[in-house]
């Protein structure tokens, strides 16, 4: 299992040996703690649940206090589950650190994209606008999206205005430029989804070229 949770710090740039500029996203990744182990015999599949970022006791409800107490770990703010292979062995309380990755690895980054609120069809779906003059009354509307008297409604799923952003987004095949184990920092080439401070999942690329 080569996956880790991290917090997006922001973007910066570094320079290659030839002087070219490389835009990178800085992610503070790990360490994660194993809070639960699932087995094929009991749950039907092999997986581990991990916790990330400390959480104050007053914000933890009673069921979760029992869950963390059973694992013998401190309270965590974020929990995620990762499937593991049959030959991988983990124990409750094990730490998963950044050293599972190396410089040059290709990864996928999963995060929640920035929320844009309610947007019109032009911004949300890249529609073309209508004429701006000559008596036109349809400047930025979505246009015809259904038939007339029948079915007399718009079918579900048609593109139009509405909520934009705040979706789970996966960016594939990004290259790790540098791994800083001392400061738990990942420098990944390019942009990753989400706001500064947002939690992202960095995993080994599934469709690496």
From Swiss-Prot:
GO terms for biological process, alphabetical: translation
Q: Name one GO molecular function term.
A: rRNA binding
**Coiled coil segments of this chain:** none
Keyword hit for Transmembrane: no
Q: Which family does it belong to?
A: Belongs to the universal ribosomal protein uL3 family.
Q: How does it assemble?
A: Part of the 50S ribosomal subunit. Forms a cluster with proteins L14 and L19.
Output this protein's name. Answer: Large ribosomal subunit protein uL3
Please name the source species: Finegoldia magna (strain ATCC 29328 / DSM 20472 / WAL 2508) (Peptostreptococcus magnus)
């Amino acid at each position: 299992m080569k996956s880790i949770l991290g917090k997006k710090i922001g973007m910066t740039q570094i320079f290659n040996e030839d002087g070219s500029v490389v835009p990178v996203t800085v992610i503070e990744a790990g360490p994660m703690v194993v809070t639960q182990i699932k087995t094929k015999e009991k749950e039907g599949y092999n997986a581990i649940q991990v916790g990330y970022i400390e959480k104050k006791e007053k914000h933890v409800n009673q069921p979760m206090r029992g869950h963390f107490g059973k694992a013998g770990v401190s309270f965590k703010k974020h929990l995620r589950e990762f499937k593991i292979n049959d030959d991988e062995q983990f124990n409750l309380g094990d730490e998963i650190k950044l050293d599972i990755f190396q410089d040059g690895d290709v990864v996928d980054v999963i995060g929640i994209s920035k929320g844009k609120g309610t947007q019109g069809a032009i911004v949300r779906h890249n529609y073309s606008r209508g004429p701006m003059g000559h008596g036109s009354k349809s400047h930025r509307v979505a246009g015809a999206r259904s038939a007339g008297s029948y079915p007399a409604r718009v079918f579900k799923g048609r593109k139009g205005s509405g909520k934009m952003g705040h979706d789970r987004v996966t960016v594939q095949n990004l290259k790790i430029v540098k791994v800083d184990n001392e400061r738990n920092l990942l420098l990944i080439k390019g942009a990753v989804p989400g706001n500064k401070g947002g939690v992202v999942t960095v995993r080994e690329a599934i469709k690496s070229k």
